[in-house]
Amino acid sequence: MKNMIALTGIGYDIHRFAEVPRPLMLGGVHIPSSRGLDGHSDADVLCHAIADALLGAAGLPDIGYWFPPGDPSCKDIPSLDIVAKAVSLIRERGGRIVNVDSSLIAESPRISPYLEQMKGALGAALGISPVRVGIKATTNEQLGALGRREGIAAFAVAAILMPEDLTMP
C-alpha cells in the first residue's frame, strides 16, 4: 500500500444575484427564492468553493481552467458536475476525499432549512458520508455588497489524502 499524505485546500466564490429570473442553487439543492445567482454555470457558489478547495488541495488548477466561463459547453451546467470533476481528478491520481467544511454568507434567503439536503447532495457527489460535509450559514451583518443583499458568497476547506510520491519534487 502506498504512503498517503493529508493535504488541505481552501476555496472561495461569490456571485451577484441575476437580473433575470433563474433558479437559486446552493450545494446542489434548489432553494426557493425570488432571485437566483448570475453565472455561466448554474452559479452554485457553494459547489464552486468546494471544487476549488479540492483542486487546491491536490495542487491542480482552479475551476476556471477546467470549466472556462466563455465555453458554451459549460453554459448552465449543474455545479455538482464541477464538484464531481474535481473528485474524479483526485481519484485518478490515487487520492480520496476525507472531508469538506464550508460557510455560506447571505442575508437572504434563509438557508438553514436546506442544510441537511445540501449535505446529502454534496456527500453523494464527493463520495463521502454527509456527516463529513460541514455547511454553516451566516450573514454579513448588513455590511458591504453581501449585506446589501447583492449576492451570496461561500468559503470552503477540503481535506484529501494523496499518494505521497505524487507530492514529492
From Swiss-Prot:
Cofactor remark: Binds 1 divalent metal cation per subunit.
Residues bound to 4-CDP-2-C-methyl-D-erythritol 2-phosphate: 13-15, 40-41, 62-64, 138-141, 148
Cited Gene3D superfamilies: 2-C-methyl-D-erythritol 2,4-cyclodiphosphate synthase (3.30.1330.50)
Cofactor: a divalent metal cation
CDD domains in the cross-refs: MECDP_synthase (cd00554)
Site (Transition state stabilizer): 40, 139
Binding-site positions, a divalent metal cation: 13, 15, 48
Annotated catalysed reactions: 4-CDP-2-C-methyl-D-erythritol 2-phosphate = 2-C-methyl-D-erythritol 2,4-cyclic diphosphate + CMP
Keyword vocabulary terms for this entry: Isoprene biosynthesis, Lyase, Metal-binding
The organism's place on the tree of life at top rank: Bacteria
UniProt GO molecular function: 2-C-methyl-D-erythritol 2,4-cyclodiphosphate synthase activity; metal ion binding
EC number annotated for this UniProt entry: 4.6.1.12
Principal EC category: lyase
Function: Involved in the biosynthesis of isopentenyl diphosphate (IPP) and dimethylallyl diphosphate (DMAPP), two major building blocks of isoprenoid compounds. Catalyzes the conversion of 4-diphosphocytidyl-2-C-methyl-D-erythritol 2-phosphate (CDP-ME2P) to 2-C-methyl-D-erythritol 2,4-cyclodiphosphate (ME-CPP) with a corresponding release of cytidine 5-monophosphate (CMP).
Family per record: Belongs to the IspF family.
UniProt name for this protein: 2-C-methyl-D-erythritol 2,4-cyclodiphosphate synthase
Organism from which the protein derives: Akkermansia muciniphila (strain ATCC BAA-835 / DSM 22959 / JCM 33894 / BCRC 81048 / CCUG 64013 / CIP 107961 / Muc)
Lineage: Bacteria, Pseudomonadati, Verrucomicrobiota, Verrucomicrobiia, Verrucomicrobiales
